[in-house]
Amino acid sequence: MSPQQIQTAGINLSPQHNNTNNNNSNNNNNNNTNNNSNNTNNNNTNNNNNNNNNSNNNNINNNNNNNNTNTNANTNINNNNNNNNNNNNNNNNNNNINNNNNNINNNNINNNGNNVNLVNIGVPQLQQHLQGILSKQQLVNQQNSSIQQQIQQLANSIMITKQQIGQGQPNAQQQQQQLQQQQQLQNFQQLQQNLHNQGASLQSQAQQIQQMLNNNGNNLNNSNNNNNNNNSNSSSNNNNNNSSSNNSSSNNNSNNNNINNNNNNGNNNNNMGNNNNNMGNNNMGNNNMGNNNMNNNNMNNNNINNNNSNNNNNNNMNNNNNSNNNSNNMNNNNNNSNSNNNNNNNNNNNNNNNNMNNNNMNNNNNNNNNNMNNNNNNNNNNNNNNNNNNNMNNNNNMNMNNNMNNNNMNNNNNNNMNNNNMNNNNMNNNNMNNNNVNNNNMINNGQQPNQQQIQTGQSTNQQLHQQLQLLQQQQRASQQGFTPQQLQQLVNQPLTPFSNQIQNPFQQLPIQQPIQQLGNSGQFSNNNQNNMSNNGNNNNNNNSNNNINNNNNNNNNSNNNSNNNSNNNSNNNSNNNGNNNGNNNGNNNGNNNGNGNNNGNNNNNNNNNNNNNNNNYNPLNNNNIIGQNGMIINNSQILGSQNGVNNNNVQQFGNPQFFPYTQQPNQLPPNQQQNQSPQPSNMVSVSTTNINTNTSSPLSTDPSDEPSSKRVKKSSSKPSKSKGKK
């Protein structure tokens, strides 16, 4: 793969606002027909993503092992068996580590089923991820320096060879030596190109996270609410892509992986093609592995930046195929492989990534994505795929970041890589939001919360707090030597600069800096893929957490049958008509077809809003919503505050109030809130159109305390006659 192809495929920061518009137009075409089948197929997609996340968690812990493995993998086809063995060992190691990391990220949370923990951590998660980004920038710079040293050594070797040849003709051995040196030089150039892309990607990610931190993780979310709601319809378009068949669901994964892993595949392909002559060059293998590890960051960035472009491709193709569905599924595979990858080999490797992930997932989930996607390629390219999976492992911190991105960005960011653990969390968050939806429906219907519900919510909150403390302890234990003060210094220090030119004694590679300035909107509207994943994960997790989530879903269904049209219309009319179509079709179809589909679509649409409103500080939301404030909006916002109780608990960066359970003068710890008597008030249902999310006024239960533009009328919606489990 040429450097130009690497640039195009590795970091394709395509215009994102255009992608959002395309997604909206696709939404209108696809929502009515495909919402019903989307959820089931999304489960398969999310299963793949979850596998990716397991591997994502590995890389941070197994960088050295991965380097060794990549060295073996670079011995090319001749060492397939060895690579398989090594990769299997690494997979075993990764699995052991994944069990630990996933237990930290997922299992502890999933056991509760409510799974608000990672969402609740909020800003600390962003800080931890920014720490990881800064560490990875240092690693990229170190690797770039190492590559530069090796290029200099190679230059010396080439000069010595030329001096030995002199004016005469080289003999066969000298010709072979020159050929090997030229191949090594090309490999080094490719590695430097990839390192530069990775450095630019990391810098872009760090800028995004820093901007989120500067905005307390809230303003970006609020600015993206409309985009995210619009994207919820486009997520159903992506769901349509997945729903077109099991194959197309793995297509979407392969699309994301195609972009995400172009650099990885480029490295592997070039090394696979060239390292036959460099089998002894462990440094190259290690550097290549480092590149691949950093390419995972490109993958994350690409998932953020390029999902819209891929989604547009998928939507355009799947809009044509939606009417034909399964007949065109294989065509989707071919089209996706051609459009998303400038290189069929990369596409094979990416599909193999999916297949490898699917194989790992098959141990847990069955699942469909192995069906028609390149089983033969999987057999041929397991080495690359294992390495790619290991490369994706770098994303422990990215998982946290994506958790934050997902939560801050309507659960959208779970970009394939992180999507993946986050998808579980999103599912769980959605389940938690199901509880919020149940509470909202109950309150909007005019029912007063009883003491048992309040105590139950407070008890749940206390349990979540205890689990959060355990999770934070585990995460702190997994960190390597960063104190909160050092972390703040890392966050405040300028980002590591990365030169626009790669120093090379033989060839100057033109590098275009792909970093773009971030806007307040559109940057995260690329998360259509993630909304799709959230739908799928809702179904998955509903299946896995049926006891908890199905109860909530039943409540949602019973309430949604009477309330969804009014609630969704009131929320979505303020955003756009596309959402009305998506929500109404999704909810109506879901109600007609059963709880699974309805909850998938309903939770996706409603929970996008709920997550934005509640994510940064969810542990107190249920108690505050039911027990203290009582002024409920459909999206679980509380009048007089931003995002529920966020304003009271989230301030500028560096304030200890970022950490949810630091006791403040006016804030009781969760174990004492249980003793507070609730302050019931009249419950109202209002549109979010006139809510000023930038206000910092204290919580108020008196509508007269609000400006006239924010006063609300009581909802005329009648209480639902259906009764759900509390």
From Swiss-Prot:
Biased composition annotated in UniProt, kind: Polar residues: 1-17
Biased composition (Basic residues): 710-726
Compositional bias of kind Low complexity: 18-109, 644-701
Protein name as it appears in the record: Putative uncharacterized protein DDB_G0286901
Region (Disordered): 1-109, 214-461, 518-622, 644-726
Species this chain originates from: Dictyostelium discoideum (Social amoeba)
Signal sequence, renumbered to the chain: none
